[in-house]
């Protein structure tokens, strides 16, 4: 079985690509990858020996471009699509699996032109423009936000350590690897009140804001586990009883799988406002909060147990394995 995985650009897309790669590897698939020289694709997969071959095309997103720049971006995708077709033919690829993002365009279009099965993983509650365009032609679209609610590929640690939270003793603020100033500012404005109630603070600041936030805690003599980024972030997350976070799909499903209640602060400039729609999905099931100016007192008075319990239907293991098994069945029919 020869599988071409394509797409990426950002960590959300790429973490899914990595999870699916590892699940396909367990099925002894021969794997290939096509991405872009833009974004993070190369830093994730350029030296990944699990892939038989990797191609990184000089392509960019089309959505926010106008005039000559849009024409140039489309031309680059068409050119890359011919190169993708060549790889697919030469390597006798059985199926293409797209995780979305502009870097998936070339290989996805190549698959359709060659009448090859195309499978799409849509991470968000609102489809990206490329996925919206390609979905009607795909063999199957996997998504955790719409029926049949496919399990999301997250690290097994989030399921293995899941627990229903009964009281708030530890809170984690997740500013992301780049940092979210809004979340960092909120954490600092809450810190004294949380300290008064003996709530342990874990705070991922992101690299850009680390020094400012670290200095604040030191100056105010507030004990906190403050760090810019940690490769073992999952170990920090599972210690917490409540999270304050952006609502990118991968983070949201990691927290949900761990039964960790959260206050989500959607990134306001996300394409199609998808972070807001991601957060609202859990909010409508009384399984999370969406930021509306809440105070630390609002969090301290929460029924943590009820919110954590309401996450149970959304906590499912082996998302990547189940998606891969489904793909394999459809290929082998």
Curated annotation (Swiss-Prot):
Q: Which EC class heads this enzyme's classification?
A: transferase
Catalyses: di-trans,octa-cis-undecaprenyl diphospho-N-acetyl-alpha-D-muramoyl-L-alanyl-D-glutamyl-meso-2,6-diaminopimeloyl-D-alanyl-D-alanine + UDP-N-acetyl-alpha-D-glucosamine = di-trans,octa-cis-undecaprenyl diphospho-[N-acetyl-alpha-D-glucosaminyl-(1->4)]-N-acetyl-alpha-D-muramoyl-L-alanyl-D-glutamyl-meso-2,6-diaminopimeloyl-D-alanyl-D-alanine + UDP + H(+)
The answer to whether UniProt assigns keyword Magnesium to this entry is no
Could you tell me one molecular function GO term of this UniProt entry?
undecaprenyldiphospho-muramoylpentapeptide beta-N-acetylglucosaminyltransferase activity
Q: Which GO terms describe its biological process?
A: carbohydrate metabolic process; cell division; cell wall organization; lipid glycosylation; peptidoglycan biosynthetic process; regulation of cell shape
Compartments (UniProt record): Cell inner membrane
Q: Which residues bind UDP-N-acetyl-alpha-D-glucosamine?
A: 10-12, 124, 177, 275
Top-level taxon of origin: Bacteria
Kindly give the Gene3D superfamilies that the UniProt entry links to this protein: Glycogen Phosphorylase B
List its EC numbers: 2.4.1.227
**Any one GO CC term of the record:** plasma membrane
- This protein's major location comes to membrane
Protein family (similarity comment): Belongs to the glycosyltransferase 28 family. MurG subfamily.
What the protein does? Cell wall formation. Catalyzes the transfer of a GlcNAc subunit on undecaprenyl-pyrophosphoryl-MurNAc-pentapeptide (lipid intermediate I) to form undecaprenyl-pyrophosphoryl-MurNAc-(pentapeptide)GlcNAc (lipid intermediate II).
Q: Which HAMAP family match?
A: MurG
Q: What is this protein called?
A: UDP-N-acetylglucosamine--N-acetylmuramyl-(pentapeptide) pyrophosphoryl-undecaprenol N-acetylglucosamine transferase
Q: Which organism is it from?
A: Nitratiruptor sp. (strain SB155-2)
Gene name for this UniProt entry: murG
């Amino acid at each position: 079985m020869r599988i071409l995985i394509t797409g990426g650009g950002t960590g959300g897309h790429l973490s899914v690509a990595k999870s699916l790669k590892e699940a396909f590897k367990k099925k002894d698939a021969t794997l290939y990858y096509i991405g872009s020289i833009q974004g993070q694709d190369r830093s994730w997969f350029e030296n990944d020996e699990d892939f038989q071959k990797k191609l990184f095309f000089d392509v960019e997103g089309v959505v926010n471009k106008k005039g000559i720049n849009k024409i140039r971006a489309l031309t680059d995708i068409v050119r890359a699509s011919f190169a993708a077709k060549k790889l697919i033919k030469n390597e006798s690829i059985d199926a293409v699996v797209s995780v979305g993002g502009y870097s998936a365009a070339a290989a996805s279009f190549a698959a359709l032109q060659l009448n090859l099965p195309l499978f799409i993983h849509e991470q968000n509650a609102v489809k990206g423009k490329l996925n919206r365009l390609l979905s009607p032609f795909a063999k199957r679209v996997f998504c955790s936000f719409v029926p049949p609610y496919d399990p999301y590929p997250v690290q097994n640690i989030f399921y293995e350590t899941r627990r229903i939270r009964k009281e708030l003793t530890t809170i984690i603020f997740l500013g992301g690897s780049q940092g979210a100033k809004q979340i960092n500012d909120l954490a600092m404005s809450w810190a004294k009140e949380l300290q008064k109630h003996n709530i342990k603070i874990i705070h991922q600041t992101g690299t850009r804001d680390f020094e400012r936030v670290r200095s604040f805690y030191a100056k105010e003599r507030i004990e906190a586990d403050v760090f810019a980024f940690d490769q073992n972030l999952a170990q920090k997350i599972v210690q917490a009883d409540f999270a304050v976070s952006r609502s990118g799909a991968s983070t949201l499903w990691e927290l949900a799988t761990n039964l960790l209640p959260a206050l989500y602060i959607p990134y306001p400039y996300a394409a199609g406002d998808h972070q807001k729609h991601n957060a609202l999905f859990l909010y409508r099931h009384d399984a999370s909060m969406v930021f509306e100016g809440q105070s630390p007192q609002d969090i301290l008075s929460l029924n943590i147990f009820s919110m954590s319990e309401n996450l149970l239907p959304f906590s499912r293991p082996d998302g990547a394995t189940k998606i891969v098994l489904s793909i394999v069945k459809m290929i082998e029919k």
